[in-house]
Amino acid sequence: MPYYPASFLSGHFKIRNVLVHVRCDVRDGADGERVLLLHEVQSDWAQSARRAIACGEMDPGDDGCPPFLKEWPALAMKLVLLHAAHQGLDAVAWSRGAHQVFRYEGLGAMGLNELYDRTLPREDNRMLRPLGGICETLGVFVPTNFGIFQTERGYEVYSLEDELLGAALTLEDARQFVPDQGHELLYEVHGVRLPESMREAILGSGF
């Protein structure tokens, strides 16, 4: 939000007023579906403001407070669902709170569990239930000794040593570059399925 009156710079970006950021990639699901897996959904701006409000250094109506202070998770999921529908993906999923707590070695466990296990499922159910969708447990395969990353030109496969093994236009074609000893684990995550009828409804009329 470069033209918002307030000015906030986070440690992640060199541009100001980034309201929310998402780190994600496309993974294979347990049933062969293409799943947009969210590894991180975060608002540095909102997090900083909430800390300042809790310490009495800021009021919710102050100029430095970001817009959508409480609504940013819902806004993030709307954008993610629109992107997934536009790309023709079969589902959107996100890691559990326990995965996030493990990643950050227990730091902010209460907030991570609240966001990933309660807030995101609640917002997805609110938006998708009228379209026949519901948050459920999905299985996704996560590589342990290689990586497949989406780029502007398709997909690239890397080894654990960060060596580029190959590139392709589609995820299916990129899999030919996975090493013979490549290994994946099946993780249970939160998610919502997006059948074709729901994708069309999202793109046609929104939420």
Predicted region positions:
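Charge-dense, intrinsically disordered terminal/linker segments
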Residues: 1-207
